[in-house]
Each structure stands twice: as structure tokens, then as C-alpha cells.
Design a protein with these regions (language model features):
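Non-catalytic signal-transmission and effector/linker regions of two-component phosphorelay proteins
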Residues: 1-8, 113-124
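Conserved acidic carboxylate
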Residues: 11
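Two-component/phosphorelay signaling modules centered on CheY-like receiver
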Residues: 14-34
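Acidic, metal-coordinating helix/loop segments flanking the phosphotransfer/catalytic sites
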Residues: 35-53
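The short loop immediately C-terminal to the conserved phospho-acceptor aspartate in CheY-like receiver
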Residues: 59-61
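Short amphipathic alpha-helix used as the core "switch/output" element in two-component signaling
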Residues: 64-78
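Alpha4 helix (beta4-alpha4-beta5 surface) of REC/receiver domains from two-component response regulators
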Residues: 89-106, 110, 114-117
Length: 124
């Protein structure tokens, strides 16, 4: 398994950030994990450091993450893997985000253990 994977978790919900951080720590060797709580801070963090994976919530303060947000991020950071993370309906939204460049979509009520493993396999 790849060591030192750099992950940015962008979600305004502290519990969701803690859960996902714990799962990444469980399944990865020595991951570097940073967290942001709004879209402005997410862009600022991306501008300061290179990440392997961005776990991006759709509904956040200072602007929601639309498919265009994914397009904009990928234009600046083409190697960055983006996974959407939302309580919104996956079936409706996932195709739009995948078409925009995201590699996955986790709905918050899904089995996060399984989804996290699948995402790690995709990123590695």
C-alpha cells in the first residue's frame, strides 16, 4: 500500500471529517491528512500544498461545490483525484460530478468503510 498519501478532507461537518480521517488512517500507511471547513479554505489549502486526494463535500459554507467547481480544480491541479462526499442523492448527482472529473462519489449514508477502501484502491 502506498505510504504518505496526502489527503485533503473538505467538509463543514466535524463528525464526518473525523470519521473519514479515521478510516484513511485505518487503511493507509502514514497518510498526511489536512482538513478544511469551507470552499474558500479548500482553495487556499490546495494553492499551498500538493495533495493526492481531495474528499470534497458538496454543500459547504462560502459556496457549494458544483460540477463546475470540480472542473475548475482539475484545470489547476490535473493530477489531483477528487471524490465527492455528500448527503445529497448520489443517483441524481454522481453522473454530473464524474463527467466533470471526479473519480468517485460517496453518499454519507452509505457504508463508508467499503467506500473508503474502493476509493483508496482507485487512487493507488
Amino acid at each position: 500500500m502506498k505510504e504518505n498519501l496526502k489527503i485533503l478532507i473538505a467538509d463543514d461537518n466535524e463528525l464526518m471529517r473525523l470519521v473519514m480521517r479515521g478510516l484513511f488512517i485505518k487503511y493507509l500507511d502514514n497518510p498526511s491528512i489536512k482538513q478544511t471547513t469551507n470552499l474558500d479554505d479548500t482553495f487556499e489549502c490546495l494553492s499551498q500544498e500538493r495533495f493526492d486526494l481531495l474528499l470534497l463535500d458538496i454543500n459547504m459554507p462560502n459556496g457549494d461545490s458544483s460540477p463546475q467547481t470540480v472542473v475548475d480544480i482539475k484545470a489547476i491541479y490535473p493530477e489531483l483525484k477528487i471524490v465527492m462526499f455528500s448527503g445529497n442523492d448520489k443517483e441524481t448527482l454522481e453522473p454530473e460530478y464524474l463527467a466533470a472529473g471526479a473519480i468517485g462519489f460517496i453518499q454519507k449514508n452509505e457504508n463508508m468503510n467499503t467506500c473508503t477502501k474502493e476509493i483508496i484502491e482507485t487512487v493507488l
